[in-house]
Design a protein with these regions (language model features):
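Extracellular and secretory-pathway beta-repeat/beta-biased strand scaffolds
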Residues: 1-665
């Protein structure tokens, strides 16, 4: 321990082919004063730890001088191979200041053979206006953490600030956990990076920082987590951090730029009964979550990227950028960080059973984007709620076993976008990702929901082959306009699906407005066919004063609705239109196609347009209805029109002007 901030505390180094720590052993290089904590370096070929009757194994380099003093930086903890004995491994990376260059920055690692940690806690935590430290683990074999925990913490420290001794903080004051191995295995374990900036603490002018830190989990072959938690959390005005589960970085410093410079994917990532979270709980900037693998399996697990309120403080250049509404119309960057974060998963095969992927906001910051880039995406319901066994998350109250993919807003921030497309190598900025080959969702809820005055979140799915929806609900819900909106023209939650063919069996696709904001539009586009069956429903509706959205279906050669419904409806406002186009045939069997408005004389029902070569109606209804308002029109343009006696086509208004039925055949 050192009280004098000019005194450098002692470091600890162990060098041996085999190191075993057991039964309450502690390796500590802590400080309780203003000096930096010491560094701990274990140069080993094999490291094994095991808790015992006398307690858990502890490796710590903490700075803890309490809330009333100014502390030093938490130290570096390095577990690696033996320099001079272990052959060095040099890797080339791009430097972040020259992203388009060839690999030009060399970093040399010394890899141990194996880490087997059981009942062990490793932490480099700073409490009391101090920057956190770094924990690094390097092995070319397996890094196993069983019933173990790794943590780093930063408290009340400004990014790029100086330490109490006047020296710059290492790593700009960011804390980091960096684990490299051929295989990384977590079981009953935790990986945590935390940061806190208090409103009443010793850092009243910290500009939205520091970050909760960086968690880099880099595995050459596989990453496996079982009943484990990976959490990157910003408290107060601290930013959420960056978490990556990847094979290795594209850049030397782990930058988060994605489309032009994707990181290398792990062969296999599997999360079972686990949770990966990046969250700004209060007023910090959002974080980034990146998981890349050739195969990603989520088995009753939850991936979460949460935000709350904007900071409303100046950035390092004195600009007020992070304010309410920032990030809604496009990317806004402050101090190198976007004011809207993102959750990105990329895989050739993404398989989700139970649990889900969520990006909620409970405050006035817009929710983070969810980007799922997969050649093949498959979901199926589980048997229980997802998350860790000790703290499962119930994402669907009615049925916790369902998969949930959701970006929702419980206050004024607005929902983020959900995009499901294909995986890609480097592509220029602002160029769309290619489509997936197959999207197959079963027992799944895909949802953007804005319960107050925030903007609606868009949902898009694009596939070259099929989009199959089995007992799956896709919904985009909005509520009220904001007072500053002009002529009611603000983003609502639109739903866009495009594929080779689209199949719906049960479930539904819905765009709903509950208030003054207009509802979103629903668009389905297929190169070959659209089939809706088994009680499936496609709807655009309004229960408030905002108009219902439109439904547009371009089905390629064929459209079939069997035991299904396609409707727009408005209780108080005007309804939306329905347009279905097909090259060859549109066929309804025991189906319902309707637009209806239940409001006053100033409302009007939506129009219905069918435009194929052949229209066939079997025990089906095509209705454009109104109560006091004007009924919508029905237009059928077809070379052949066939309707059995039990089918009904009607455009009517009970007390207003009825619409017209126009069949051109």
């Amino acid at each position: 321990n050192a009280v004098d901030p000019t005194v450098v505390p002692g470091n600890i180094a162990m060098t041996a082919q085999r190191v075993e720590l057991a039964n309450g052993t502690a390796v500590r290089a802590d400080t309780t004063g203003g000096a930096d904590a010491g560094a701990i370096t274990l140069n080993v070929d094999t490291l094994k730890t095991q808790s015992g009757p006398d307690g858990r194994v502890l490796i710590s380099s903490d700075s803890n001088c309490g809330s009333q003093c100014v502390g030093g930086q938490a130290g570096y903890i390095t577990l690696q191979g033996i320099p001079g004995f272990t052959p060095p491994s040099t890797r080339l990376y791009r430097h972040v200041t020259a992203p388009d260059s060839e690999p030009n920055r060399a970093i040399t690692y010394y890899f141990a053979r194996e880490f087997d940690l059981r009942g062990t806690d490793i932490h480099s935590d700073a409490i009391g206006n101090a920057p956190g430290g770094i924990v690094m683990m390097r092995t070319n074999g397996q890094a196993s953490l069983i019933d173990s925990g790794v943590s780093v913490t930063t408290q009340d420290f400004t990014i790029n600030d100086n330490k109490p001794n006047g020296q710059p903080a290492q790593n700009q004051g960011f804390s980091r956990i960096d684990i490299m191995g051929r295989d990384i295995v977590l079981k009953d374990s935790t990986i945590k990076a935390n940061a806190e900036v208090s409103d009443i603490g010793s850092c009243p002018l910290c500009q939205g920082g520091p970050s909760a830190g960086e968690i880099w989990l880099r595995a050459e072959h596989s990453f496996t987590a079982d009943n484990s938690l990976i959490a990157n959390t910003g408290h107060g005005r601290a930013q959420a951090g960056i978490t990556k589960i990847i094979k290795d970085h594209y850049f030397s410093f782990g930058a988060v730029w994605d489309a032009p410079y994707p990181d290398a994917p792990i062969d296999t990532v599997k999360l079972t009964n686990s949770e990966v979270t990046v969250e700004a709980l209060h007023e910090g900037l959002p974080g980034y979550l990146r998981i890349r693998g050739d195969t990603i399996i989520l088995d009753h697990s939850v991936v979460n990227s949460q935000v709350n309120n904007v900071t409303n403080v100046l950035d390092s250049q004195g600009r007020l950028i992070d304010v309410v509404g920032a990030g809604e119309a496009g990317t806004v960057v402050t101090d190198g960080r976007s004011v809207q974060g993102s959750l990105l998963m990329s895989a050739k095969n993404l398989d989700i059973t139970g649990g889900g992927i969520i990006a909620p906001t409970q405050g006035n910051r817009i929710a983070n984007r969810i980007e799922l880039h997969a050649d093949v995406l498959t979901t199926s319901p589980g048997t229980r709620a997802g998350g860790t066994l000790a703290a499962p998350r119930i994402l669907d109250v009615a049925d916790p076993s369902r998969v949930v993919i959701s970006s929702s807003s419980g206050s004024t921030g607005g929902a983020g976008m959900i995009s499901i497309t294909g995986v890609s190598g480097p592509i220029p900025d602002d160029v769309p990702y290619p489509p997936s080959s197959t999207i197959r969702l079963t027992g799944t809820d895909v949802l953007t929901d804005t319960s107050s005055i925030g903007l609606g979140g868009r949902i898009e799915m694009r596939a070259r082959g099929p989009i199959e929806l089995h007992n799956t609900n896709i919904s985009a819900n909005v509520t009220d306009l904001r007072p500053q909106s002009v002529n009611g023209q603000e983003q609502s939650g639109n739903i866009d699906l495009s594929a080779g063919n689209i199949l719906m069996e049960g479930g539904g696709i819905s765009a709903l407005t509950r208030g003054t904001r207009s509802g979103g539009n629903v668009s389905l586009s297929a190169a070959q066919s659209v089939t809706v069956s088994d009680g499936a429903a496609i709807s655009a509706s309004s229960t408030g004063l905002g108009n219902a959205g439109n439904i547009t279906i371009n089905s390629g050669p064929r459209f079939l609705a069997q035991n299904a419904s396609i409707t727009t409806e408005a209780n108080q406002a005007s309804g939306g239109d329905i347009i279905i186009q097909a090259i060859d045939s549109i066929r309804f069997i025991n189906g319902r196609l309707s637009t209806s408005v239940l409001g006053g004389p100033d409302t009007s029902g939506g129009n219905i347009t069918l435009d194929p070569a052949v229209v066939t109606l079997q025990n089906s209804h095509v209705l454009a209805q109104a109560v006091q308002g004007q009924g919508g029109n029905i237009t059928i343009i077809a070379g052949t029109f066939l309707a059995d006696p039990t089918s009904v086509i009607s455009a009517s208004s009970q007390f207003g002007l009825s619409g017209a039925v126009n069949i051109q055949s």
